[in-house]
C-alpha cells in the first residue's frame, strides 16, 4: 500500500553514506531506526486523516479533503527525510534558511540544493503513487507536492530560529515533525478549498 512504499524509500536514503554521516556526527541515531516518538510524530496527521475518512466525519463534502490530507502528510514526511538525508550525504554547500550563510551539514534549519531537489522528487514520486492508486487526482497531486515543500521550508525556519534555543528545549525533532507533517496536510486541504472556490 501507500505507507509501506514511503517507509522503504525513507529507510534506503537514511542508510546512504551512513559511515560518512556518522563520522560527521549528523547520522540518525541507532543506524536510522526510528523510536516510538518518531513513528508517532511521522504518522499522527495521516492517521487522523484516515480516521476522519473512515468515520465519514463531515460527510461526503469532506471525504476528499481527508484523503488529500492523508496523502499530503506522507508526501511531506518523505520529502523532509529525503531532503535531509540526501543533503547530509551529497550536499556540496549547506545554507541556513534565515541568513543564507554557509553552515556545516546537519545544522538545524539548513538546506542544500541537492537535498531540496531530492525532496521535491520524493514528494512527486509519492504523490504519483497516490494518483495511480486513485487517492488523488492530478491537480491534487500537485497540491500535495506544493504543500510538502511549503511545510518543509517552515520546518527549516523553526529549526533555524527556535530549536535548541533557551526556552524551547521541548521543541525536539519529534514535536517539529508533528507540526511539519500536520502543516503539510492542512495546507493541501486549504489550497484545495481555495482552488474549488476560485473555479466556482
Where are these regions (language model features)?
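Hydrophobic alpha-helical transmembrane segments
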Residues: 1-200
Amino acid at each position: 500500500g501507500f505507507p509501506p512504499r514511503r517507509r522503504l524509500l525513507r529507510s534506503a536514503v537514511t542508510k546512504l553514506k551512513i559511515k560518512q554521516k556518522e563520522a560527521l556526527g549528523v547520522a540518525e541515531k541507532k543506524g536510522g531506526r526510528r523510536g516510538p516518538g518518531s513513528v508517532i510524530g511521522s504518522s499522527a496527521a495521516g492517521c487522523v486523516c484516515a480516521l476522519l475518512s473512515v468515520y465519514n466525519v463531515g460527510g461526503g463534502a469532506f471525504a476528499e479533503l481527508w484523503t488529500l490530507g492523508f496523502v499530503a502528510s506522507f508526501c511531506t514526511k518523505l520529502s523532509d527525510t529525503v531532503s535531509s538525508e540526501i543533503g547530509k550525504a551529497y550536499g556540496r554547500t549547506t545554507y541556513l534558511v534565515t541568513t543564507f550563510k554557509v553552515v556545516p551539514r546537519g545544522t538545524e534549519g539548513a538546506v542544500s540544493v541537492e537535498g531540496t531537489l531530492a525532496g521535491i522528487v520524493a514528494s512527486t514520486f509519492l504523490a504519483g503513487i497516490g494518483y495511480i492508486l486513485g487517492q488523488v487526482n492530478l491537480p491534487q497531486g500537485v497540491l500535495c507536492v506544493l504543500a510538502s515543500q511549503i511545510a518543509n521550508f517552515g520546518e527549516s525556519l523553526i529549526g533555524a530560529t527556535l530549536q535548541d534555543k533557551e526556552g524551547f528545549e521541548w521543541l525536539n525533532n519529534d514535536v517539529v515533525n508533528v507540526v511539519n507533517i500536520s502543516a503539510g496536510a492542512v495546507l493541501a486541504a486549504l489550497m484545495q478549498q481555495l482552488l474549488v472556490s476560485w473555479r466556482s
